Amino acid sequence: MKKYKKNKNDREYIPSYPEKYCGTYPIICRSSWEYRMCEWFDHNKSVIEWSSEGHRIKYFDTLRVKYRIYYPDFYAMFKNRNKFIIEVKPQKDMRMPLKKGGKSHKTMMMRESTFINNRDKFKAAKQYCKNLGYEFIVITEKDLFRGN
């Protein structure tokens, strides 16, 4: 079982339709975006089951040169039986940062490290999903706030 370390900005989600939730409790959201996704899964009639951080994926961290474990944000199954592993990330973490403006060297190194780490995790997640017949998707603020 995954050990959980609580951070000050974490928030617990309590489902309105607990019969749809197939994960462990408490449901911890590490961002308002994750909380919004929980609400969407919980209230969307096409979602028949969902969980938070319910899958454990081994991946190779190319920066630390070792294997690590990745817990994607969500799993969801829809009425059509399509299954997804879903990660919620800021758009800025989805591309290699470009040096512009007054960004410090330290900031650039951290952003590059985040991008590379995400690339490693997502590569493993795509293979994991392929093996299970699932689809892996990353949702960014552009997806979350489209049409709002």
Give names to the regions the model predicted.
Residues 1-148:
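Electrostatic, structured charged patches in enzyme active sites and in nucleic-acid/phosphate-binding
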